[in-house]
């Protein structure tokens, strides 16, 4: 054994004992013939006292082994900021296990470094307490989730990561098959179809911490490879899945964030979330709700609002508390903010702090009658600003106001950063119209989630009558404006599945090609089933108090999908390309077999 104790485990009760420690030189301080070294390992830091002649070669991040006696620090020299701050180790033996070159990245929590440097030297970055504690928290989260699920008799089952390409919204990462030139595997975007097959197979309660891959345009805080806590259950209702989701989340937040979540977690419908917050993942740590003004402003002569109302669209508003104090430049800046989001602008009025009189471009275009009651309708006070959005499409206008709501909360310091606010968003739309014929298929509609999501009871028998209003047994859990998990009850009846395919314009041939193996399995008594998947990177990010999912991933990539550590992705050689069969054309028989399950194999006679 190289060491007898962890550096961070030493306490005053260990005084008088001889220990052997191993770790890195975190800091060195010379004091006239004596050198003090902060020795760091994965458990923490211990102070080691060495003779100068023994330790003069030591530099930061040398890896060393020290044997010595634990003694109490002299009175007045204790360090209350360290768990080991009452003691030190007087070294009797020192062994340099390996030396360290000059550091490209300071291994110091007090010194910030750029993301590119941190990712390029991630192994050094992980020696810092912040990044290291984030990964330890993630490991603890994994263990807690497994404990909750095993308490409920779930099975941890691995599903393939080399599979066939199926449509799930984003592009697949494709892998050429050397032994079958011209054919390709796909890395899974989720274990969705396999976990449903496990339900057909009678596994009933499945989970895995699954690696998933999506070749999508990089935006916001995304990674091309990510992790889900993936769950599926047989013979369950929506309430059963939600109850399990709450059990997992409440245990995680209690043990890792010290926060007791009040259960049941509130539920709001998707349409209510859009109407009140302009988002299907609302941040409930603050108020500032949207107000629809379509009926209130009916009859207005202001062309922007009148045009939207006449088109059967939407006019709404959101209030910025104290917003009237903004300068003209700041108010004009909101127009640039809106245009950056694809809108034409963001109309506004400000209410005089003394008189409450409405001023601004919109005020000049509204009637005295409409202006008189406006503040009461939207809940504004003197000194506030009111922002408006209008459009023939309600959702786009609501989403613009929803984004404004978030920006208002940020600028007006309305967010309690120490608070946790959870909700479920339920009864999501089942379909949405798509104008891209290639994406939508012959039906002109696409599934909001996936084509195996079940309609809710109200729409089960009539979703074809009004696809734009049909609701699904789909549910998302939201924390502080972040969607951290989502799922649905699945279709298990063949007649309902066929009706969905018909609406989506998916022909029997296309269905067999895309989902043949699943449809074949569904001929043999599939149980009612449903599930949920948690975005594990985002869950851990929130628990760690981090600003990006990169902080809780061991070796993350940049926003452009580049890995500064390994310089991946890289070109392949001509020889590799030829051997992998990248340019080969598939044989006709391989194309004919794709996606078909074929006839069922004969069942052996048990006698």
Swiss-Prot record:
Full protein name: Aspartate--tRNA(Asp/Asn) ligase
Reactions this protein catalyses: tRNA(Asx) + L-aspartate + ATP = L-aspartyl-tRNA(Asx) + AMP + diphosphate
Assigned protein family: Belongs to the class-II aminoacyl-tRNA synthetase family. Type 1 subfamily.
Keywords on record: Aminoacyl-tRNA synthetase, ATP-binding, Cytoplasm, Ligase, Nucleotide-binding, Protein biosynthesis
Subcellular localization, as worded in the UniProt entry: Cytoplasm
Alphabetized GO MF terms: aspartate-tRNA ligase activity; aspartate-tRNA(Asn) ligase activity; ATP binding; nucleic acid binding
Chain positions covered by the region annotation Aspartate: 192-195
Entry EC no(s): 6.1.1.23
Binding-site residues, L-aspartate: 168, 214, 449, 490
PROSITE patterns, sorted: AA_TRNA_LIGASE_II (PS50862)
Pfam families for this protein: GAD (PF02938), tRNA-synt_2 (PF00152), tRNA_anti-codon (PF01336)
GO biological process, one term: aspartyl-tRNA aminoacylation
Principal location listed in the UniProt entry: cytoplasm
Subunit structure: Homodimer.
Any Gene Ontology CC annotation: cytoplasm
Compositional bias (Basic and acidic residues): 580-590
Annotated HAMAP family: Asp_tRNA_synth_type1 (MF_00044)
């Amino acid at each position: 054994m190289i060491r007898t104790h962890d550096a961070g485990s030493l306490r005053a009760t260990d005084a008088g004992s001889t220990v052997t420690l191993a770790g890195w030189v975190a800091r060195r301080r010379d004091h006239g013939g004596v050198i003090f070294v902060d020795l760091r390992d994965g458990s923490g830091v211990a102070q080691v006292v060495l003779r100068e002649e023994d330790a003069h070669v030591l530099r930061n991040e040398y890896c060393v082994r020290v044997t010595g006696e634990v003694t109490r620090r002299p009175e007045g020299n204790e360090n209350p900021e360290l768990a080991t701050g009452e003691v030190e180790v007087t070294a009797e033996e020192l062994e340099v296990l390996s030396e360290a070159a000059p550091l490209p990245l300071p291994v110091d929590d007090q010194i910030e470094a750029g993301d590119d440097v941190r990712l390029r030297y991630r192994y050094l970055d992980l020696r810092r307490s912040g990044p290291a504690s984030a990964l330890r928290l993630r490991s603890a989260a994994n263990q807690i989730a497994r404990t909750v699920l095993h308490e409920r008799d779930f099975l941890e089952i691995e599903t393939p990561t080399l599979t066939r390409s199926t449509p799930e919204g984003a592009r697949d990462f494709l892998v050429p098959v050397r032994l079958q030139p011209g054919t390709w595997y796909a890395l899974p975007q989720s274990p969705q179809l396999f976990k449903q097959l496990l339900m057909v197979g009678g596994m009933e309660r499945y989970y895995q911490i699954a690696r998933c891959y999506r070749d999508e345009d990089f935006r916001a805080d995304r990674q091309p490879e990510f992790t889900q806590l993936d769950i599926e259950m047989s013979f369950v209702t929506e309430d059963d899945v939600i109850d399990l989701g709450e059990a997992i989340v409440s245990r995680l937040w209690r043990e890792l964030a010290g926060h007791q979540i009040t259960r049941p977690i509130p539920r709001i419908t998707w349409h209510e979330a859009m109407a009140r917050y302009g988002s299907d993942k609302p941040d409930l740590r603050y108020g500032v709700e949207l107000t629809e003004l379509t009926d209130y402003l009916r009859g207005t002569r202001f062309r922007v609002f009148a045009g939207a109302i006449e088109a059967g669209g939407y006019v709404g508003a959101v209030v910025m508390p104290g917003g009237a104090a903004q300068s003209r430049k700041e108010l004009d800046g909101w127009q640039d903010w809106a245009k950056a989001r694809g809108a034409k602008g963001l109309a506004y009025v400000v209410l005089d702090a003394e008189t409450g009189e409405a001023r601004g471009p919109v005020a000049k275009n509204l009637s005295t009658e409409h202006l008189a009651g406006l503040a009461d309708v939207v809940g504004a006070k003197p000194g506030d600003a009111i922002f408006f959005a209008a459009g023939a499409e309600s959702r786009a206008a609501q989403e613009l106001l929803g984004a404004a709501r978030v920006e208002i909360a940020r600028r007006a310091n309305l967010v309690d950063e120490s608070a946790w606010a959870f909700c479920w968003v339920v009864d999501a739309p089942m379909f949405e119209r798509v104008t891209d014929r290639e994406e939508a298929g012959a039906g002109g509609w696409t599934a909001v989630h996936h084509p195996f999501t079940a309609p809710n009871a109200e729409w089960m028998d009539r979703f074809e009558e009004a696809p734009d209003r049909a609701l699904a047994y789909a549910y998302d859990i939201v924390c502080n404006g972040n969607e951290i998990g989502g799922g649905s009850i699945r279709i298990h009846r063949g007649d309902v599945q066929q009706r969905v395919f018909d609406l989506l314009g998916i022909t029997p041939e296309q269905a067999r090609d895309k989902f043949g193996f699943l449809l074949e399995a569904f001929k043999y008594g599939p149980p009612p089933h449903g599930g949920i998947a948690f975005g594990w990177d985002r869950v851990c990010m929130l628990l760690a108090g981090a600003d990006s999912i990169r902080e809780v991933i061991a070796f993350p990539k940049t926003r452009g999908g580049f890995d500064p550590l390994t310089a991946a992705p890289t070109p392949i050689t001509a020889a590799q390309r030829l051997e992998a069969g990248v340019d080969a054309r598939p044989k006709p028989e391989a194309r004919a077999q794709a996606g078909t399950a074929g006839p069922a194999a004969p069942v052996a006679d048990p006698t």
